[in-house]
A protein has these predicted regions:
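Class I SAM-dependent methyltransferase Rossmann-like catalytic core
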Residues: 1-20
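Exposed alpha-helical structural elements
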Residues: 8-12, 37, 146
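Generic detector of short, locally flexible boundary/turn motifs and exposed helical patches
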Residues: 10-16, 25-28, 135-141, 162
């Protein structure tokens, strides 16, 4: 999924880390193109998009928690607007971390306080492709405090959370220790 504020965050964060992503390996968890995507921001990279169902932007059909590629496979691991639909978001985050190279970056955007529930049977399941197909009727607006149980100071040399009160998004960027 993509919306203006989220796209801007990804673009600014990615450019802050590295001005040229050519020849880099990038993983996107939740890559199904609902209404735009971030893949175009990383021209020349080796880009792998995963999601729960086939569709535009999806290279491999698998959940982020079940992806079992080798440790430190990617220079950048990204998830945009999917953690709020994922009952295993915590484990997915840690799996993305595992697959990110030391000195590489982990970046995510997700819904936070104030965003209306979407992508469930109670709303419009088309807002979260694939989740209903595998039995995930889940929605949670995540907050920075939801990550307190992780020892982020040990996992990352630097990290930052931002909250966008206009779009009701939580943004994260961390450099793997």
């Amino acid at each position: 999924m993509a919306h203006y504020n989220q796209l801007n965050f990804v673009k600014v964060a990615a450019n802050h880390i590295k001005s040229d992503w050519g020849n880099m390996k990038i993983l996107e968890v939740g890559s199904y193109d609902v209404n735009g995507n971030i893949r175009a921001l990383f021209q020349g990279s080796e880009y792998t998009g995963i999601d729960l169902c086939e569709g535009k932007g999806v290279d491999i059909v698998i959940s982020g928690v079940d992806l079992a590629l080798p440790d430190e496979s990617f220079d950048l691991a990204i998830s945009c607007e999917s953690f709020e639909h994922n009952p295993t978001w915590y484990e997915t985050f840690l799996n993305m971390y595992r697959m990110t190279k030391q000195g590489g970056a982990l970046l995510f955007t997700c819904a936070t306080t104030g965003r209306l529930e979407h992508g469930t049977q109670r709303t419009d399941k088309n807002d979260s492709p694939g989740t209903q197909d595998i039995g995930w009727d889940y929605y949670k607006n995540l907050k920075k405090s939801d990550f307190d149980a992780m020892d982020l100071n040990n996992l990352f040399t630097n990290y930052v959370f931002f909250t966008d009160d206009l779009s009701h998004d939580l943004y994260f960027l961390g450099i793997k220790n």
